[in-house]
Amino acid sequence: MTYQQAGRVAVIKRIAGWLVFIPALLSTLISIINFVYLYSQKGTGVNAVMLDFIHVMTDMARFNTPFLNIFWYNSPVPNLEQGLSAGNIMFFIIYMLIFVGLSLQASGARMSRQVRHIREGIEDQMILERAKGNEGHSREQLEEKIVLPHHTIFLQFFTLYILPSVIGVLGYFVIKLLGIMIQG
């Protein structure tokens, strides 16, 4: 892949990363809000006040964001009692798409940095080639020699493999803690 092609691929990867990340993040957040809203039961004392606050905030967010109705009505709500149900699997897939989008964006940003560095290197080399006179290489000859490797998102280890696991474990403990607080 030439460095001009790499520049275009880098822009496409960055745009695709944001186009995957933003809807996946919105859907996941709305799924979690709906989960807390649906599985919070009426309680007494301080818990009742907290649950009423959660219900009011959820209703207010839903009312004030009609442009997100596609997410409010279609985002899968996880159910801890059902195990591998369709809703839980869809929630997990959408959750993982957050990190796929981040990895795409990071891969595109890395390619963009490399292309910028190569472009600056070619400009520097052209100054030296002009100093050589007729013996120097042309810009086209220098560009033909440059071949960039393909960048895959699967090499983004932290973003794609570690971060989802850490956030998932923390989320599991928070949900369990909320479940304990709600029950008593």
Curated annotation (Swiss-Prot):
This protein's membrane topology, according to the annotation, is:
Multi-pass membrane protein
Locations listed in the record: Cell membrane
Matches recorded under InterPro entries: YniB-like
| Keyword Transmembrane tagged | yes
Tell me any Pfam family this protein matches. Answer: YniB
- Please provide one cellular component term from the Gene Ontology annotations of this protein: plasma membrane
Which residues span the membrane?
A: 15-35, 84-104, 162-182
UniProt entry tagged with the keyword Transmembrane = yes
**Keyword tags:** Cell membrane, Membrane, Transmembrane, Transmembrane helix
Q: Which domain of life is it from?
A: Bacteria
**Can you tell me which family this protein belongs to?**
To E.coli YniB.
Q: According to its UniProt entry, what is the function of this protein?
A: Putative regulator of YfeABCD, an ABC transporter locus involved in inorganic iron transport.
Which protein are we looking at? Putative YfeABCD regulator YfeE
Query: Which gene name does the record give?
Result: yfeE
